[in-house]
Amino acid sequence: MIIPVRCFSCGRVIASDYVRFTEACTKIINETGREPRGEEKAKILDDLGVKRYCCRRMILSHKDLIDEVLPY
């Protein structure tokens, strides 16, 4: 629903990285008109300094559902 502030496994702060990750993905969508590919997402995460696979999992697997749940 809401991106966790810290990684569940290692405790690293990831909320700020998630915001920058979504901004970079939106930029790719606006420039190319398509979703970013896996290699592009990997490069974005590398550029953000997200090296651990547990933190990468937290960012890549998050689905923002707050707007759908908020009316209830």
UniProtKB/Swiss-Prot annotation:
<keyword id="KW-0808">Transferase</keyword>
<comment type="function">
    <text>DNA-dependent RNA polymerase (RNAP) catalyzes the transcription of DNA into RNA using the four ribonucleoside triphosphates as substrates.</text>
</comment>
<keyword id="KW-0548">Nucleotidyltransferase</keyword>
<comment type="similarity">
    <text>Belongs to the archaeal Rpo10/eukaryotic RPB10 RNA polymerase subunit family.</text>
</comment>
<dbReference type="GO" id="GO:0006351">
    <property type="term" value="P:DNA-templated transcription"/>
</dbReference>
<dbReference type="InterPro" id="IPR000268">
    <property type="entry name" value="RPABC5/Rpb10"/>
</dbReference>
<keyword id="KW-0240">DNA-directed RNA polymerase</keyword>
<dbReference type="GO" id="GO:0005737">
    <property type="term" value="C:cytoplasm"/>
</dbReference>
<dbReference type="GO" id="GO:0008270">
    <property type="term" value="F:zinc ion binding"/>
</dbReference>
<dbReference type="Pfam" id="PF01194">
    <property type="entry name" value="RNA_pol_N"/>
</dbReference>
<keyword id="KW-0862">Zinc</keyword>
<dbReference type="GO" id="GO:0003677">
    <property type="term" value="F:DNA binding"/>
</dbReference>
<dbReference type="GO" id="GO:0000428">
    <property type="term" value="C:DNA-directed RNA polymerase complex"/>
</dbReference>
<dbReference type="InterPro" id="IPR023580">
    <property type="entry name" value="RNA_pol_su_RPB10"/>
</dbReference>
<dbReference type="InterPro" id="IPR020789">
    <property type="entry name" value="RNA_pol_suN_Zn-BS"/>
</dbReference>
<feature type="binding site">
    <location>
        <position position="55"/>
    </location>
    <ligand>
        <name>Zn(2+)</name>
    </ligand>
</feature>
<keyword id="KW-0804">Transcription</keyword>
<comment type="subunit">
    <text>Part of the RNA polymerase complex.</text>
</comment>
<keyword id="KW-0963">Cytoplasm</keyword>
<protein>
    <recommendedName>
        <fullName>DNA-directed RNA polymerase subunit Rpo10</fullName>
        <ecNumber>2.7.7.6</ecNumber>
    </recommendedName>
</protein>
<keyword id="KW-0479">Metal-binding</keyword>
<feature type="binding site">
    <location>
        <position position="54"/>
    </location>
    <ligand>
        <name>Zn(2+)</name>
    </ligand>
</feature>
<feature type="binding site">
    <location>
        <position position="10"/>
    </location>
    <ligand>
        <name>Zn(2+)</name>
    </ligand>
</feature>
<dbReference type="GO" id="GO:0003899">
    <property type="term" value="F:DNA-directed RNA polymerase activity"/>
</dbReference>
<feature type="binding site">
    <location>
        <position position="7"/>
    </location>
    <ligand>
        <name>Zn(2+)</name>
    </ligand>
</feature>
